[in-house]
Structures are given as structure tokens and as C-alpha cells.
Amino acid sequence: MYDNLKSLGITNPDEIDRYSLRQEANNDILKIYFHKDKGEFFAKSVKFKYPRQRKTVVADGVGQGYKEVQEISPNLRYVIDELDQLCQRDRTEVDLKRKILDDLRHLESVVANKISEIESDLEKLTRNK
């Protein structure tokens, strides 16, 4: 799993926190950030440079003119797919944690209200005797 990341020398992809991608001249610059350890001010990161792929395409759709366009490298596209899987999984785990905490707070509220209702009913019973 994560063969493309491992081919970049990233031995533990689960340590990846986030990534950034920018274009610089004829290159795409990928920067991968790892989770910070306690006591570290900055997250460890690694940077990779991918040359953009050049293609010649029909410019006007009629077939008379051509123009050169640059696209992201196919290898980089595969790496980004793996990074998106990792980063999306982290977001999903955070969303699930938030949902569980919200459900727990709601349950606390429901239980507190039910306890108050039962105590009120008990109070009514003891006053009537």
C-alpha cells in the first residue's frame, strides 16, 4: 500500500500530516509535512520537484493550429492520489470523533433531563403522602 510514496523514500506514510503543491516555472513542487513530535517547533517536511509534462494539442479544434500545454506529471498524480487518501482518512477520523463527542453531549443532556423528570415525579409522590 502507498507504493508511490514508498518509492519516494517515505517509509511510514501514516506519519504524514498534510501536503502542499505549487507550480514554479516548468516544475511542480510537492512538499509533504509530517506530524510534529512533542517539543518540536516545526514539523519535519520533505520537498520533491517534478518537471511538468509538455503536450502539443490542437489549438482551435479545426486542426489548423497547435499549441503546447503543460500538465502535471503522471507520477505526481499517483503520489497525490495516495496523499489524498491519507489526508482524507485523517479528516474522516476527526469528523467521526466530533460526531461521537456531539452524540455524547446530547446523551448527557437527555439523561440529565430524564433524571430531573424522575426526581420531580418522586417529589410529587412524597408530597402527596
Curated annotation (Swiss-Prot):
InterPro entries: UPF0325
Superkingdom to which the source organism belongs: Bacteria
Record-linked NCBIfam families: PRK13677.1
Family, per entry: Belongs to the UPF0325 family.
UniProt-recorded name of the protein: UPF0325 protein ESA_03178
Organism per entry: Cronobacter sakazakii (strain ATCC BAA-894)
Biological classification of the source: Bacteria, Pseudomonadati, Pseudomonadota, Gammaproteobacteria, Enterobacterales
